[in-house]
Structures are given as structure tokens and as C-alpha cells.
Amino acid sequence: MQAERGARGGRGRRGGRERPGGDREPVGAATALARGGCGDGGGRRGRGRGFRRGRGGGGLRGGRWEPGGRGGGASTRVEEDSDSETYGEENDEQGNFSRRKIVSNWDRYQDTEKEVNGESGESQRGTDFSVLLSSAGDSFSQFRFAEEKEWDGETSCPKQNSALYVDSESLVRALEQLPLAVRLNVASELIQTTIPLELPQVKPRRNDDGKELGMHLRGPISELRSAAGACPRSLGRGSLRQSPLEGLQKAPTPTQSVADHLEEELDMLLHLDAPVQEEGNISPDQTSRDQEPEKDGQVAQEETGPEKPSVTREKNVEPEQPSTSKNVTEEELEDWLDSMIS
């Protein structure tokens, strides 16, 4: 009875109590530990060693208190099993993920190449696009509806659709047989069928006026200079402003008069410096002042007629012009030229 009580965790006498100072180990200690209890095998008073937490007191497992007793051991064991399984799964997953590698499947293609080489003796990893298209088949090999098959079955005959059928080759041959005038839709007279043996001669138009001018200018220089010496050197402002073209336009129709006028223009161009120097020395203010007394003298002559003072006055004005023209500086001459140009 006592042995049974000890196995059950009762009050029975324990075998180690008779030894003084010895460790008392209950008979049912192994059974109590197997059940998850601690102390004295899960006794009522909790006399076992360790932490006394009543009947079947729990113990410290993994840094936390686990429930003891009859039902505590089984639940703890299930939790430990589940924790170990999850921890193992995590370790397995981490290990598999870290060790994962890309597996090449090129061996399959190499096997197929070996077979092809054994059959034909040629190694070809890729084929041409045309070969792929030919192997794919045409549109008739694909899926088609029943209506499409019916359309293909109905072969169109040119005799049935004569209104819509046109033979292009025969049309081209018929058009080539037509004459060129009909094809171009122009008059037949405009088209020259034969090639001419001689081309028509085109006579260029000559400028007679330019020829005459060139012949006059080609004359000897001595004659031009002699003719130029005959013309007066004192030219007015109007003659300076006239261009050679204006002089030619105003020239008379006879050739002699044209030649004389050309000589005059040439002499004018050769002696441009002399009249410019003579007239350039006269400022516009002085010319206006000189013109005023001339006008006054003319008016006085018309009014008084035989009065001598007006005549003497005109004579005195004329010699004054060259004396005053010499005193004009170059700056005044440039100013006058600028005023004339503007």
C-alpha cells in the first residue's frame, strides 16, 4: 500500500527517511517527473524538493514558468513539440533560400542536338525565319469558319463576272498599238515623227546702237583730244550733273552729231578735276550773293536804260569772283560738296 501511495504521490513512508542526513528520493519521483510534476512527486502538501507550488507544482523552463500537475506536462510537451517544429521549419526555409541556385536546363537542348547530329550530321541551334514560317503552315491549315470554306469553294470565273473583269495585259498591248498623238490626246500636226536632217539656224539679234557707240569710242585718241580741246572747259552745274546716258538720249539722230556729243562727254569726263576746282572754290553763300547783284543790275538796266553806274557795277562784280574763290578753304569745299550730294 505504501509503495502504491508513493507511486501515486500520497503520504506513504519513503524509503530514504531512515537514513540520517541523506537525500530523500521518493519512490514515485520518476513517475512524477514523467508526468510533469516536481517536488515530492506531486504530493498533496508539496513536500518535494525545489519550488513548492502545491500539488504538482510547475518548474522554470526556458526562462518562464510552466504549469505543473497532472495535465500540465502534456500541454507543455505539445507546446515544445510545436515550437521545435516551427523553429526547425524556419531554419530549413532559411537554409534552402540561402542555398538556392539557378539550375541550367541547357542539357536538354544538348541532348536534342546530339540526336539531330546523329541523324543529319549538322549542328544547328536555330533555324531561319522562312523555315519557321514554312513549318507553321499557310492560312488553309489554320482554323476557319464554315462561311470561309464556302467562299473558297466558290471559284470566281471571269466569264461570270465579265463586267468587272479587266485583262490588263491585253489592254497594255492595245494601247501600245495606238499612235502617239492619240495616246497623248494632241493634234497629229504637233508631233514630228521623222527626225530632221538639218536643224534651223537661229540668227541672234544684234544691238545696232551699242555697235555704233563702240565704233565711235574705238577712234584714235588724238582725234578725241583735239575735239575735246574745241569744247569749252567752263561747264556749269547742269552739265556736271548730266550723265553720259542723258547726253546720248538728247543727242540728235545723225551719226556725226552723236559722235560730236560723245567727244564732248569724253572731254568733260577727262577734265572733271579742273571745273570742280574752279567752281568748287565758290561757296553757296557767295554764289547766292553774286547772283543777287546781277539780278539787281539787270532790273536797273531795264528800268533806267542808259544809266552807266549800273554797267560799271556789273563790271566790278565780275572780276571780284576769281579773287574771292581763291580764299575758299578745303573744308568749305567739302561742306559744299556734302550739301550738293544731300
UniProtKB/Swiss-Prot annotation:
UniProt feature, compositional bias: Acidic residues: 80-93, 330-342
Sites bearing Phosphoserine, chain numbering? S82, S84
How does this protein assemble?
A: Binds Apaf-1, BCL-2 and BAD (Bcl-xl).
Question: What subcellular compartments does it reside in?
Answer: Endomembrane system
Membrane-related topology note: Peripheral membrane protein
| Species name | Mus musculus (Mouse)
Q: Which GO terms describe its cellular component?
A: endomembrane system; membrane
For biological process, the GO terms are: apoptotic process; negative regulation of apoptotic process
- Give the highest taxon in the source lineage: Eukaryota
Give me the stretches of Basic residues compositional bias: 44-55
Q: What is this protein called?
A: Cell death regulator Aven
Protein purpose = Protects against apoptosis mediated by Apaf-1.
Q: Where does it mainly reside?
A: membrane
Bias-annotated ranges (Gly residues): 56-74
* Ranges where the record places region Disordered: 1-130, 228-257, 279-342
Q: Which PANTHER family match?
A: CELL DEATH REGULATOR AVEN
Coiled-coil parts of chain: none
- Give the lineage: Eukaryota, Metazoa, Chordata, Craniata, Vertebrata
Regions of compositional bias (Polar residues) in chain numbering: 120-130
Keyword tags? Apoptosis, Membrane, Phosphoprotein
For bias type Basic and acidic residues, the affected ranges are: 15-26, 108-117, 287-297
InterPro entries named among the record's database cross-references: Aven (IPR026187)
